[in-house]
Amino acid sequence: MDAILPVPVDGFRFDTGSGSCCKPRNNLESGTTNRFTCFNESESQSNPSPTESKVCSDYLPVFKYINDMLMEEDLEGQSCMLEDSLALQAAERSFFEVLQDQTPISGDLEDGSLGNFSSITSLHQPEVSEESTRRYRHRDDDEDDDLESGRKSKLPAISTVDELAEKFEEVLLVCQKNDQGEATEKKTRHVKGSSNRYKQQKSDQPVDMRNLLMQCAQAVASFDQRRAFEKLKEIREHSSRHGDATQRLGYHFAEALEARITGTMTTPISATSSRTSMVDILKAYKGFVQACPTLIMCYFTANRTINELASKATTLHIIDFGILYGFQWPCLIQALSKRDIGPPLLRVTGIELPQSGFRPSERVEETGRRLKRFCDKFNVPFEYSFIAKNWENITLDDLVINSGETTVVNCILRLQYTPDETVSLNSPRDTALKLFRDINPDLFVFAEINGTYNSPFFLTRFREALFHCSSLFDMYETTLSEDDNCRTLVERELIIRDAMSVIACEGSERFARPETYKQWQVRILRAGFRPAKLSKQIVKDGKEIVKERYHKDFVIDNDNHWMFQGWKGRVLYAVSCWKPAKK
């Protein structure tokens, strides 16, 4: 969809004049930009209900922002920023271990782990790599080819201006649709249809997929290769990449277990994502926020809290650790533009992991340009600076913080990818939190997955990942539309990539290391923060949005300074706000 309409954005320039919030080498000053409008708010929002209006006001700026991104002519060749960064980070650490002749910390390997399993089974490697691969993967080659060819064939089909406008209208007007009954009926038909379709291909005998997966994991942990492959064969007979939630769970966990056995999964990023393009990321994001409130509620809580804090501020400085594409900020920018006293000067410091190649900061620079254009539309003064480094290597001297400004540190769903003390004795995770405290912000906004699958022991980690991912697969099957390509992409980006890391990798190669909200709380308190209680009105509004707009099994709850999001009683995400213990 990046090549839908190749229209360059003209009239935007860089300058190194005064008033920048950062060093001259990466200043982003004001310039002119052409405004593209394909959405009439007055026409699309006629007579909305109060709750629907509230939902629309939260969604529309994001969809406008995505609209502008889709107009960029070089989007097709770009891959996902986070995938590239994590792949580079894992490669650097692996290379460093080789140079230093280091081995993973012993706590990360147990009797049941397979850190050295590849050497033990080297005599059987030809059998695994040829016969096993041919037996287990040939079945899905046609499905993969169909999926890829389908995606490629769809891009040229929407290259005309009329079809482009239709796609934009679908994105921008999605929050106006209030047809939950119809959507639920479609989802039900989709689930039933897919189940019937795969029942014809798979065995009709019901199986306990979780039990099979646990038995296979136990065989892997005890180095019983024969039994492990027997269980893998049984799992594959009852699983499919495009089946129901249980079949998908079995398929992808079997892939991860086989990768662990054969030792072929050293960089799970490349194997699971094949460098997902920016266009596909936008498609997945659009479908995800329509069906699941988890990410939207993280942004909603953070933005509302920041907006209340900066209600009278003349300068608001947001230091965003993990800014990615800046999807969080269009809503806040629009809210700031509506202040009675006028918008403040918005300074954003975008921090990301470096990209591979000769321009490690290229993507985070592009995010600044997009935010600049969006601020110009709403007449919000804007300054932007960027840092592309591993977070543990960033120091206070890299940041430019002025006196008298309201400073906010923001970190949403990214700290789990920072290594902990099991990778390095000087925990990069704690180092990053100490930096957050050294910034001495007026507010620290934090959100993370509530995950229990960070144990150094493989079996414990596998079991907890199995329970967590079962809930996610069930949630996506229940809520996402029948567009199988979109659902597959969302699952790949939000479940499979991390599951591959957790199951197939050890040491520095395991990049996903989530913790429970209680463990995060201990770390944050130790870094020198104290909890800031969430506004009751914000929590109330969030509950109303989820209740009116989303599936009834989504749950929003709060406990003092934490807001929890869950699915069928299981807490999946947690959001909180913090202030320095001593200002």
UniProtKB/Swiss-Prot annotation:
Expressed in seedlings, leaves, sepals, stamen and pistil, and in the quiescent center of root meristem. It is found in: Nucleus. Residues 407-501 are annotated as: PFYRE. Keywords: Nucleus, Transcription, Transcription regulation. One of its GO terms (cellular component) is nucleus. Interacts with SNRNP35 and CYP95. It comes from the Eukaryota. Residues 131-140 have a biased composition (Basic and acidic residues). Belongs to the GRAS family. The keyword Transcription regulation applies. Residues 207-266 are annotated as: Leucine repeat I (LRI). This is Scarecrow-like protein 30. One of its GO terms (biological process) is regulation of DNA-templated transcription. It holds the Pfam family GRAS. PROSITE patterns: GRAS. The keyword Transcription applies. Residues 115-124 have a biased composition (Polar residues). The gene is SCL30. Residues 107-154, 182-205 are annotated as: Disordered. Its main location: nucleus. GO terms for molecular function: DNA-binding transcription factor activity; transcription cis-regulatory region binding. Residues 285-350 are annotated as: VHIID. InterPro entries: TF_GRAS. Coiled coil: none annotated. A motif (VHIID) lies at residues 316-320.
